[in-house]
């Protein structure tokens, strides 16, 4: 057992002790009753709606907003977070802060109470149950965690989380040279479920199809993706390579809306997670506007997520009560291809929790050369720059990285922020 195994096993044990058991044994049984019973669903959300002081909508349909009046967005929270943070009470006495930079590179800190973390785990667990997973089953994890020092340990870039029976694999070391190592590790572990970034599992799947390699594990029931937009072409590639259905989970650090995929591929808006309304954007696209039911420490109402969905009028054959959308149009980060062939997707972890970063952008110049562009806050120090470079090297290995302080980061022609910018021809 290496140090990474000890670290992640202890982390899982402590999380299970604090929130996991409560989520699975108390919250999950209650919310599972909402799936096929409109009456149970209405009964569950009614007290939540009363507390948020909004009217009760049809729980099985999505309401459309006439205008953006009365909505809030990320900028409002960043500028005045204290106005959204609630005073301490008995129910919110235990709280913590979670940080994200998302697709904008602008660090955002959300205060959440312990009950929020417990309920979040319960809702995610319900999604995993839809995919055929039960607690204790073998699971593989291919996301943004630093689980390797850059060298394979017993042939794999990763470690075992013994407490949760999980094979933790690095999403930063996948390349044409290492893909077979990953597949061999998956075959030996033979997981029931794989949880992954779409870009990470897609890198393996596309290599498998290009090299006519079949997945040889015989227990895999499903792959659950999250944290990035899952394109349909990417989903089809993954399903073809691994021979199982891909389930996708949509959520955000603000905890105002969630969408889960069922066994028929329907994208269900979980109306027992938060109150979701639709704000017309363009053509047939609508922005998700959510009101949190779960977080009592930081109440967010009518929050514009910035993520778009396309509606449909079909009834999902699974029979669940939750309304569906056709597709989710969220973040589309570029992928960086390093000199050794590794493809790197999400790097927003670099800026998480960086209080002195107003905005951040990752620029790749080719040949393992990075520029980390930063709009710095007034308390910026040299140590902040050193920490950013250290975080980058922890994830992608030893590369050349420089921090560039700028007054602003230009938007593209469409006015959108480009979190990962590739300037290899510069």
PLM region spans:
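AMP-binding/adenylate-forming catalytic core of the ANL superfamily
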Residues: 194, 284, 296-399
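Nucleotide 5′-phosphate-binding alpha/beta core
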Residues: 1-99, 105-138, 145, 188-195, ...
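Adenylate-forming
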Residues: 171-178, 191-235, 248-253
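Conserved beta-strand elements of the Class I
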Residues: 138-140, 289
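AMP-binding/adenylate-forming
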Residues: 118, 140-200
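Conserved AMP-binding/adenylate-forming
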Residues: 221, 225, 230-315, 332
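Short hydrophobic/charged patches on amphipathic alpha-helices used for structural packing
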Residues: 180-183, 187, 212, 348-351
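Short, hinge-like loop/turn segments at secondary-structure boundaries
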Residues: 157-158, 212-215, 264-268
């Amino acid at each position: 057992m290496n140090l990474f195994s000890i670290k992640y096993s202890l982390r899982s044990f402590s999380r299970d002790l604090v929130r996991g058991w409560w989520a699975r044994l108390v919250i999950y049984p209650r919310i599972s009753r909402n799936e096929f019973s409109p009456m149970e669903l209405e009964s569950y959300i009614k007290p939540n709606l009363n507390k948020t002081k909004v009217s009760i909508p049809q729980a099985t349909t999505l309401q459309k907003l006439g205008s953006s009046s009365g909505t809030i967005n990320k900028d409002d929270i960043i500028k005045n977070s204290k106005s959204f943070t609630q005073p301490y009470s008995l129910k919110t006495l235990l709280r913590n802060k979670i940080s994200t930079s998302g697709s904008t590179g602008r660090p955002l800190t959300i205060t959440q109470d312990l009950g929020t973390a417990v309920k979040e785990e319960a809702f995610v667990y319900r999604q995993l149950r839809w995919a055929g997973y039960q607690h204790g089953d073998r699971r593989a994890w291919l996301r943004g965690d630093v689980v390797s020092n850059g060298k394979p340990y017993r042939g794999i870039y990763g470690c075992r989380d013994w407490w949760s029976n999980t094979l933790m694999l690095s999403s930063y070391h996948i390349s044409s040279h290492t893909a077979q190592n990953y597949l061999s590790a998956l075959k030996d572990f033979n997981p029931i479920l794989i949880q992954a970034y779409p870009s990470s599992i897609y890198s393996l799947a596309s290599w498998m199809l290009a090299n006519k390699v079949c997945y040889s594990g015989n227990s895999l029931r499903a792959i659950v993706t999250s944290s990035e937009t899952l394109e349909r072409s990417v989903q089809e590639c993954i399903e073809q390579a691994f021979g199982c259905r891909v389930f996708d989970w949509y959520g955000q650090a603000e905890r105002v809306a969630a969408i889960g995929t069922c066994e028929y591929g329907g994208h269900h808006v979980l109306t027992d997670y938060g109150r979701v309304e639709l704000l017309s954007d363009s053509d047939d696209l609508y922005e998700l506007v959510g009101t949190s039911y779960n977080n009592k420490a930081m109440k967010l109402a009518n929050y514009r997520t910035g993520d778009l969905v396309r509606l449909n009028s079909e009834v999902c054959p699974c029979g669940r009560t939750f309304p569906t959308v056709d597709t989710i149009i969220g973040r589309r980060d570029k992928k960086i291809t390093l000199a050794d062939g590794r493809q790197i997707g999400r790097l927003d972890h670099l800026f998480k929790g960086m209080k002195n970063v107003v905005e951040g952008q990752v620029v790749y110049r080719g040949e393992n050369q990075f520029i980390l562009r930063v709009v710095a806050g007034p308390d910026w120090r040299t140590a902040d720059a050193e920490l950013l470079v250290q975080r980058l090297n922890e994830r992608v290995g030893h590369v050349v990285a420089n921090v560039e302080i700028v007054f602003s980061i230009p938007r593209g022609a469409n006015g959108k922020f480009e979190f990962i910018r590739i300037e290899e021809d510069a």
